[in-house]
Amino acid sequence: GDYPGQMFAAIAGTSMSSPQVAGIFALLKQAHPEWSPAAAKSALMTTAHQKVRDNDRVSMADPFDMGAGHVNPGGLWDKRGSIVQPGLVYEAGLFEYVALTCGQDWGIFTPGSCDFLEGLGIPSEAYNLNVASIGVGQLAGSQTVVRTVTSVADKGAKFRAKVEAPEGYDVTVTPNRF
């Protein structure tokens, strides 16, 4: 817009974060052209930091306010734990997204296609889409959620799962070391 008399204007929000994340994503794909879009997206999500303030700029944001957090392309680009070396990535491809639409009963694909994917063991439940975030709607009782990670770390790297469960929920990760 036009800001008469002003030489500078600070702009923030989703309209600015989208082009910034797109640029960071392009740099990440340049560093790892062999990574799928899902792997690159998971690298951005799992290396984001969660020290994000809410809209009031005083209280800390919760996951519903900030999503995965604040993407952090800076710092040591090649350091372990950076977006270029996240350690683990989550893969999801065409079959996983087609199975997701089957599970939503949108009628986009034929029942035969959906049966084929089910026969391959590809889950159709939205909460089992192999992405870096987990969301379970209408949770009553217990629910098993499955994620598969792919190591992009140096050979011999070891990992330990750590979960900060929402208040009132118990979360167990099996195995928790790999």
Question: Which residues fall in each region the model found?
Answer:
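Secreted peptidase-domain scaffold signal
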Residues: 62-178
